[in-house]
Amino acid sequence: MAHVLFWRKFANSVKSGCVSRDLKAAGAIPGQAGGGINLPGYSRTGIRKSKTGRWRAAALIALNLFMIAHIIQWQIMGKTVSPIEPSETMYTLQNGFVNAGFIFFGLAILATLLFGRFVCGWGCHILALQDFCGWLLKKIGLHPKPFRSRLLVYVPLCAALYMFVWPVVYRIFSKPGHEPIIPKFTNHLVTTNFWATFPSVAVAIPFLFICGFVTVYFLGQKGFCTYACPYGGFFGLADKFSPGKIRVTPACNQCGHCTATCTSNVLVHAEVKQYGMVVDPGCMKCMDCVSVCPNDALYFGFGKSTLLAPKSNVIKRHYSLTWPEEIVGALVFLGSFLAVRGVYALVPFLMALGCAAVTTFLTLKTWRLLRARELSFYRFNLKSSGKLHKAGWVFVIFACAWIGLNMHCGWVRYHEFLGNVAFNKVHLPDEVALAQLDPARWLSPADRQNIIQGKEHYLAASRTGLFVNNEALPKLAWLEYLLGDAEQSVQTLGTAAARQKDESKALSLYYRGAILSRLGRYDEARATLDEALAERDDLILARQEKGEALWQLGRRDEAVSVWTDAVQRNASLVLANNELAGAQRLLGNLEQASVHEKQGDQFTPNNPFYHWVLGRRLQDLGMTELAEKHFQQAGQLSSSGTELPGQN
């Protein structure tokens, strides 16, 4: 009787295309647990191996090799095609820079509108990392389980709107009246600084590890795509309009092999039964489901889009969270994202999204672990009968370390943010502050308060931080100078310059050289300004300052040569023209002095502070006659009651 029931169950299962756990365990099916044999072309689960998997792996490997070749070509030739990265579109929308990333992103969206999300499945380096991680985990017997949330799936779309739509909206409502809504487009298809918009290698490595591996381990395959990728936000939206879908024929017997194989966490068998096609925008057209179908019932074809599919609630989706947990999870995600984004001026936007998704999972899982009597993760039993096992303690320790680091980043970011807010509220112009050694004596009460608060916040972030914020250091140095501590400011700027590169380093060196000149350390100032010009030869302000240092050292011919070079590069430089006029007058070249004086006057704004700054700088160089002229003009323009600093 038992044998009859067994084979009846087997026959019914074959008819329906499904095999029960009892039959699998009994070894009645080839390749299943408990016995049997493995048929060629089939995995141990009895599901046919995907033939497209290798083709897709080859495509993704080729993509990564192409990216490496792109970087090598740039290193060898010094210039190359701008990064083929969708994030470059931001610079097109904000500044009108037409680059390769913008063109690629536009074509990818158009392709998705027609064919669906093939670009995601076959042409994304982050997805390649996620698939590689999933493959490694399966090799050691760990099968990533999808983390399913109702609310967090909207994060990619929100991130996409923030990256690509918000800048346009902001430009429309905040642009000056003379600026067009759409910026003038310029050609930036070729670049000499390929890595300018990317994080450093030291940041890129943990970024790829978190977004390509950690997210898969905790959130399941395509975890980053599902809960963090902003480009996927637009691709998923475009997929709803696409006529290209995975579709089904009447040969389907609902075996479920397609769903079991899908690495995009799509309920393929249920959707094709209900709609005749896959409607989930998470489908990345990997084609594994088509390849493994034992009846060849699935295919890619064109027809009606998701928007035209009938509405239905038949398919019941099982989520990982209750609604209260969803709300808490959304708040945790937002808090974590704000805590880590930009902390230490290191963590980029996409990395912050990946970190926030993992933090959300760990927070909610830890909360459940503390409350539940039974809980497992992968094949590890974390807790049973209300008692934590060794694996549970390991999970709790890791989760607490991760969440604790996240909270620490939030504390540092809080001080960095408030420091930046205070810094941006200081209204004293740099030119006025550098006109004399001690600007602190004539700061407004509001400026003084903001400077003190900004310095306190930057120092608090520095004292408690694990890394140095190279962008905050120059700001701290400037606040120190404004408070009258020029010596400390010079030291801080030196520290900043030693840690910076390119334009940032050049600016720190420029300000350091300018402050050294105010301290009377002209030889050090000249050397520092030479370093700045070595980083950025086009930094005209550094040339002006270098000329002043040379003049103070008695090397007047060299000073005149430097100022002349600056004016030749930019004829509208008011200070350099006035310095040349004063120098030529002292050297007896009155005709040349008159030419430069007129040229300087042509571009001098009718602002009393501007004339006062010119007078002060010229007075320090011993060009008293020209200085007095500007002091008088400043006095005339300030007759309305504007209070100017003293001349001494």
Where do the PLM segments sit?
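Membrane-interface segments at or immediately adjacent to transmembrane helices
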Residues: 407-498, 524
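Register position in tetratricopeptide repeats
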Residues: 482, 518, 552-553, 586-587, ...
